[in-house]
């Protein structure tokens, strides 16, 4: 007997897929398997839990049981999938197996932990479960070091600072948000973080961590060191591809899919942070929403093709929020930047003066949707 459509994962991508399927078909069998509790929470809230004084349980929006009842699902929480037998269409755990008609991998991404001595001392905040394991240490910590000055690193740095902690950010880039935008566009946020008291150690290389009587001693290049109470790894995410690899699927940075979200095995699909679409991994909410809508149609034998319009990426740093869109890291762009008290507008134009990317901050974020319409992709 088949378990119908089987989904591995229970995060935002999996839940959006379930909701879209159930809008179109209330009876087709849906089976979800995940290693976590399968309770729903809003993952972006993890960037603000410390300043809000929240505990992990405070984030729960809906229990797994309520989710199963509302959407007519079979759920298998706290279940580690050990193997996918693609030839026989079987998903296996240590104690169970499920036969699928179609399989969806919504396995997400895992935090990158820099491979340095003492790496086991680093905390991660990529899930409600991870925060639950780290919350006591983080709330008690007076001195926090964040490894990584990207999107999540900047959000966490501001949040910890707003909670009254002494915050240091270490990154080997010359500016914050280096993977998202040029320094001309990120300098305003960088200045604001410094104003708030965040110690930015840029162009710095992490070399190791060691537990001492006074805390965690963090060694950096050029014989520098700092002692803190907690170290948080925010150095990026790696798509979780191990199951897909074992199943013989094509892997590049993520699980390679076509415009139908179909992998190299026509019965297996991938969605969310683990999927690589047109050579790109898009770990943001809007592409996941659009991908879930498209995939629901394909799983129900309706033709759906994913077309991604220009989309906003939001940097949730409350004291200086930012929106960006387009190919902000293109080397051939000229940046026209207007900075005023109420915010920044940075436009990246190509040699033909066509708008290819932009960054807006604070009150200028209201111009984002008009700029989106002008973007040339």
From Swiss-Prot:
It is an enzyme of class 1 (oxidoreductase). Transmembrane segments: none annotated. InterPro entries: FAD-bd_OxRdtase, FAD/NAD-bd_sf, FAD/NAD-binding_dom, NO_rdtase_NorW, Rbx-bd. Its EC number is 1.18.1.-. Keywords: Cytoplasm, FAD, Flavoprotein, NAD, Oxidoreductase. Its main location: cytoplasm. One of its GO terms (molecular function) is oxidoreductase activity, acting on iron-sulfur proteins as donors, NAD or NADP as acceptor. Pfam families: Pyr_redox_2 (PF07992), Rbx_binding (PF18113). Pathway: Nitrogen metabolism; nitric oxide reduction. It comes from the Bacteria. One of at least two accessory proteins for anaerobic nitric oxide (NO) reductase. Reduces the rubredoxin moiety of NO reductase. Belongs to the FAD-dependent oxidoreductase family. This is Nitric oxide reductase FlRd-NAD(+) reductase. It comes from Klebsiella pneumoniae (strain 342). The lineage of its organism: Bacteria, Pseudomonadati, Pseudomonadota, Gammaproteobacteria, Enterobacterales.
């Amino acid at each position: 007997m088949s378990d119908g459509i089987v989904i591995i994962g229970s995060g935002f991508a999996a839940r959006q897929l379930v909701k879209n399927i159930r809008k179109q078909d209330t009876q087709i069998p849906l089976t979800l398997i995940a290693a976590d509790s399968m309770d729903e929470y809003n993952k972006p809230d993890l960037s603000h839990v410390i300043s809000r004084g929240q505990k992990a349980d405070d984030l729960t929006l809906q229990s797994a049981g309520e989710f199963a009842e509302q959407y007519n699902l079979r759920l298998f929480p706290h279940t580690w999938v050990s193997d996918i037998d693609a030839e026989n269409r079987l998903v296996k755990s240590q104690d169970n197996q499920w036969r699928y008609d179609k399989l969806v991998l919504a396995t997400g991404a895992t935090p990158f932990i820099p491979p340095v001595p003492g790496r086991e001392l680093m905390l991660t905040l990529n899930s409600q479960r991870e925060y639950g394991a780290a919350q006591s240490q983080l709330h008690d910590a007076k001195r926090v070091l964040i490894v990584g000055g990207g999107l999540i690193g900047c959000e966490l740095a501001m949040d910890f600072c707003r909670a009254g902690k002494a915050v240091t950010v270490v990154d080997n880039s010359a500016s914050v948000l280096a993977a998202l935008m040029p320094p001309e566009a990120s300098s305003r946020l960088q200045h604001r973080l410094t104003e708030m008291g965040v110690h930015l150690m840029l162009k710095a290389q992490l070399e190791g961590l060691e537990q001492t009587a006074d805390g965690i001693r963090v060694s950096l290049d050029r014989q520098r060191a700092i002692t803190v109470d907690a170290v948080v790894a925010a150095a990026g995410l790696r798509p979780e591809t191990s199951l897909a690899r074992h199943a013989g699927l094509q892997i590049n940075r993520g699980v390679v899919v076509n415009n139908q979200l179909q992998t190299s095995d026509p019965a297996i699909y991938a969605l969310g942070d683990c999927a690589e679409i047109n050579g790109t991994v898009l770990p943001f909410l809007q592409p996941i929403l659009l991908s879930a809508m498209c995939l629901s149609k394909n799983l129900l034998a309706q033709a759906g093709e994913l077309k991604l319009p220009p989309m906003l990426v939001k940097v949730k740093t409350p004291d200086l929020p930012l929106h960006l869109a387009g190919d902000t890291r293109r080397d051939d762009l000229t940046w026209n930047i207007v900075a005023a008290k109420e915010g920044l507008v940075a436009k990246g134009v190509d040699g033909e003066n066509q708008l290819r990317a932009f960054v807006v901050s604070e009150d200028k974020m209201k111009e984002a949707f008009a700029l989106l319409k002008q973007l040339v992709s």
